[in-house]
């Protein structure tokens, strides 16, 4: 027999997750829409997305890149995108030789071109490797888009667009981030290819 406390906990967590998304719908829609616009504009100009984050945010970055290069809903042309945590040899080389804080900035030196979009993900907005990457991306002429939560940390000052999810709970922030990344995929497919997901 299922423990009633466990069932109620599941219900409470699902409601909490939904409530964070509802708050984001009230507070973050302009930034989310602007992020979609900047990504679509970059792809229309034959630029690429370079995506990065640590831990769970690295997984979100990899997920986003997979849906850009592969597909989200519709079969369409592949879109150029790189995830800066996907190559273990590169990650460990840079972390060992230059320090972990330089992990993403060093790769931007190698890959980024003016007009590319640097998308950084950090639930706290305080990850030094992400902040350094945004500073380097700006020096290199990239558009900068951030996904964060809590009070945004140092990210809003370094981003052309920064979506600050209205929550202090890491898991709830991450759940909202993946929804936003899916919204961006949907918007890109609609604007570039006329493919509507609904």
Protein language model features and the residues they cover:
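Structured helix-beta-strand junction loops
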Residues: 20, 45-46, 158
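Glycine/serine-rich anion-binding loops at beta->alpha junctions
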Residues: 48-65
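Residue-level recognition of alpha-helical structural elements
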Residues: 6, 28-32, 57, 138
């Amino acid at each position: 027999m299922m423990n009633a406390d466990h069932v109620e906990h599941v219900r409470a967590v699902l409601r909490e997750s939904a409530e964070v998304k509802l708050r984001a719908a009230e507070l973050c829609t302009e930034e989310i829409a602007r992020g979609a616009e900047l990504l679509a504009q970059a792809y229309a100009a034959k630029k690429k997305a370079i995506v990065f984050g640590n831990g769970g945010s690295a997984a979100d970055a990899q997920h986003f890149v997979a849906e850009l290069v592969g597909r989200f809903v519709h079969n369409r042309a592949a879109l150029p995108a790189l995830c800066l945590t996907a190559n273990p040899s590169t990650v460990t080389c840079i972390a060992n030789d230059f320090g972990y804080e330089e992990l993403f900035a060093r790769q931007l030196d190698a890959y980024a071109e003016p007009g590319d979009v640097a998308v950084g993900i950090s639930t706290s907005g305080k990850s030094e490797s992400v902040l350094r990457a945004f500073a380097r991306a700006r020096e290199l002429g990239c558009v900068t888009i951030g996904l964060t939560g809590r009070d945004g940390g140092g990210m809003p000052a370094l981003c052309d667009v920064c979506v600050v999810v209205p929550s202090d709970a890491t898991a709830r922030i991450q759940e909202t981030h993946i929804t936003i990344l899916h919204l961006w995929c949907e918007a890109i497919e609609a604007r570039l290819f006329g493919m509507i997901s609904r």
